[in-house]
Amino acid sequence: GVTLEIEVNVMPGKGNLVLTGKLGDVMKESAQTGISYIRSISGQYDVKPEFFQENDIHIHIPEGAVPKDGPSAGITMALAMLSAITNHPVRADIAMTGEITLRGRVLPIGGLKEKLLAAKNAGMHTVCVPKENEKDLSEISEEITEGMEILLVEHMDQVIKAAFV
């Protein structure tokens, strides 16, 4: 497991979602699901509905030569898009993993041990983990989780609350 940095730019355009960084199909679909969820809640953040027709959103995951795939970055991409759209900063010491649904539910992921180790090595103090992965935590040594706050999340609302500064 490695941590991925996710960059999002919003610019005037025609409502396109641009995805770069050698992303696989599942990861691209995850980004699409994330933007659909963000659009559905954008009114809560005073984002006008026409915003999404008048702007393009570009998601880039650096190290473009390295292939990336899977649904695990779904909540992270959704949060990054919401942050870029609302100009609301995200804490620098938080990592997260989880598949996102159209309704903002957070679904379980695989490889939790490796992901937590990568987060620890990257200096993260807090990690949002799907509640459905709680059973996997018992198999992970305290050496890895020591000094880290593990937040078990079921919905994007919890992720947003934990991550926004």
Feature roles, as predicted:
Residues 2-165:
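Peripheral, non-AAA+ core regions of ATP-driven protein-machinery
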